[in-house]
């Protein structure tokens, strides 16, 4: 205790005060290092934010080391700043390698470029999403889901091809690439609930889609709240697009357009809808769906 008090006394009370200050300013290297420190500590989060921080802090420590070696000739100041520069450099190389080593199959690259990259989703986050999914092929006239039979146990995004959506043999709308196949079904259930499809989804052409199992995706949401909010936004937007696409297809009577968002649509539309030519085509394709 006495040693600690004597050390504190020698550092604070017995340390000579600065009676005279240097009139001349430090060299440009010192001020450059200070500027790099200020700008470096303004870095953001995420992998690219860390690259920004460690690159500028490393340059700041390197400038301080040069200043200590050239201007004030202080070996201890030079040593500490150089060690800190090496640490920042190693961190920068490690993070850059992590970012560069992220590779995906072609389908995932297309999905990221078209759906996730425009939203500013970093590659490491997308890698976490992709690791929980699988790429599946669906041949023409085969079914992804059948009305009243297929359970809702996954969530999928179409990568290529086109899916035809029907209910009781009546055509509703198409699903195009980079749209969810089953966003309305997913949104209609709570995590603890189970359900079956109320529509039939048939491949109009050869298709490929990325699919997540329901339980695995909910586990991912529980671990990463950011990913949960991201999917909530994507699914909500996709459902809105499907509603507008379906609204454009609905006609009541002779060329009278009816808005499906009106509350009494369900009771008015079903009896008056005439069967479309696609009904027979859908029935002919049922043999593929039952396999």
UniProtKB/Swiss-Prot annotation:
Expressed in cardiac and skeletal muscle. One of its GO terms (biological process) is regulation of membrane potential. It is found in: Membrane. The chain crosses the membrane at residues 27-44, 48-70, 77-99. SUPFAM superfamilies: cAMP-binding domain-like (SSF51206). GO terms for molecular function: cAMP binding. It is a multi-pass membrane protein. It comes from the Eukaryota. Glycans are attached at residue 4. The keyword Magnesium does not apply. Keywords: cAMP, cAMP-binding, Glycoprotein, Membrane, Nucleotide-binding, Transmembrane, Transmembrane helix. InterPro entries: cNMP-bd_dom_sf, POPDC1-3, POPDC1-3_dom. One of its GO terms (cellular component) is membrane. May play a role in the maintenance of heart function mediated, at least in part, through cAMP-binding. May play a role in the regulation of KCNK2-mediated current amplitude. Belongs to the popeye family. This is Popeye domain-containing protein 3. It comes from Mus musculus (Mouse).
């Amino acid at each position: 205790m006495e040693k600690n008090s004597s050390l504190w006394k020698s550092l604070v009370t017995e340390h000579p005060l600065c009676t005279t200050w240097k009139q001349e300013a430090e060299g440009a290297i010192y001020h450059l290092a200070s500027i790099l420190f200020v700008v470096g500590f303004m870095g953001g989060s995420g992998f690219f934010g860390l690259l920004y921080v460690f690159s500028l802090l490393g340059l700041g420590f390197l400038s301080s080391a040069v200043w200590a070696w050239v201007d004030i000739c202080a070996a201890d100041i030079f040593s500490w700043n150089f060690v800190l520069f090496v640490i920042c450099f190693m961190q920068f190389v490690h993070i850059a390698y992590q970012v560069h080593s992220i590779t995906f199959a072609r389908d995932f690259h297309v999905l990221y470029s078209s759906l996730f990259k425009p939203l500013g989703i970093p590659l490491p986050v997308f890698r976490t999403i992709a690791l929980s999914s699988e790429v599946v092929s669906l041949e023409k006239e085969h079914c992804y889901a059948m009305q009243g039979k297929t359970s809702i146990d996954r969530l999928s995004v179409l990568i290529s091809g086109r899916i035809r959506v029907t209910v009781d043999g009546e055509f509703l709308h198409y699903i195009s690439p980079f749209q969810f196949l089953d966003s309305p079904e997913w949104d209609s259930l709570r995590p603890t609930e189970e359900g079956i499809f109320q529509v039939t989804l048939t491949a109009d052409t050869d298709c490929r889609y990325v699919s997540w199992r329901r339980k695995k995706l909910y586990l991912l949401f529980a671990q990463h709240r950011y990913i949960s909010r991201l999917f909530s936004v994507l699914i909500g937007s996709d459902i809105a697009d499907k509603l507008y696409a379906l609204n454009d297809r609905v006609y009541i009577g002779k060329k009278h357009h009816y808005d499906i968002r009106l509350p009494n649509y369900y009771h008015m539309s079903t009896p008056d809808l005439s069967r479309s030519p696609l009904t027979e085509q859908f029935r002919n394709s049922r043999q593929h769906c039952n396999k």
